[in-house]
Amino acid sequence: VHQRIGFVVGAVTFSMSVLASPTLAAPSTLVGSDHEPIEVQRVQQGTATPPQQTAPTRPLIAVAHRGAAGTAPENTLAAIDEGHRLGAETVEIDVQLTSDEEIVLMHDTTLERTTDVTEVFPDRAPYDVGDFTLEEIERLDAGSAFDQEFAGEPVPTLREALDRLQEHEMNLLLEVKEPSLYPGIEHQISVELARSPYWLVPNAPDEPHRLVVQSFDWESTEHSKSLLPSVPHGLLGQVPKDRIADYDWAQMINPDHESIDADYVAAVQSAGLEIMPYTINEADGMWHVLEMGVDGFITDFPETGQRAIAEFLEGRADLAADEESEGSEESVELAS
């Protein structure tokens, strides 16, 4: 049973001591739908995490990569809106820290590729994210590099993204980029999430995860899990099959889609973890991993992904119906 950060469902009160201390919350009581109190434990850095649980059966999902990076500027509110418009239930975004320790959405560790930073700050090479304040980054245009239609689109903060996602009732796959460059970013993220307890309440077992935190830095991911034990965490990259059991604190492994096969998918799932490979933009590739048995996949084109999943499920249902029909015919023949 996962612990949760202290808040009260319904009234949504939260101990704001989280904002000033590594301790994320004082002990408090959750009130369930049946009004029975549920004790909530103190969550501290280094708290032991609960044992791995068997992965529930959740619907297949196509995660909108960096928003919907195929049709809107990545890691912007416009991309989140586009993902929502295209029917995505879950969005993946990347976060890093500014020099004044504000959390912003950005994939690359430099600002050059996706913004006009070289024009606004021509003497600030190499344009590392961590060398700029939030106020400076807010002056940048993160849309024009993708298309002039999005000129003036700003680099959003994590808080702005969380608000927009909640407004759309969307789920979040949150990637922590290069955490070794930003000591303490795991705690900064946990503090930001604590401002909106909505993100700390897991969805039902038959629904997509409301929030998953992931990174290629597995030590950072484990530390984040100790801070946010109620939140599922994922390992980006391919964990060797003989080491999957070592990561019993994780709930997900998300590798490059070209690095896996059906045996690897089965190994991950037999350990009670889910698997959602990245980044697949062609329908054939989506079908390929769906046939392996994955729990979902990450794509720049969520509309294509949703269509592939729908067609895959329809085909599987038709196959099951045919097999059931054949079985019924055989039973009739045997009876006669």
Where do the language-model regions lie?
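Phosphate-group recognition and catalysis centered on beta-loop-alpha active-site segments
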Residues: 2-11, 15-18, 22-336
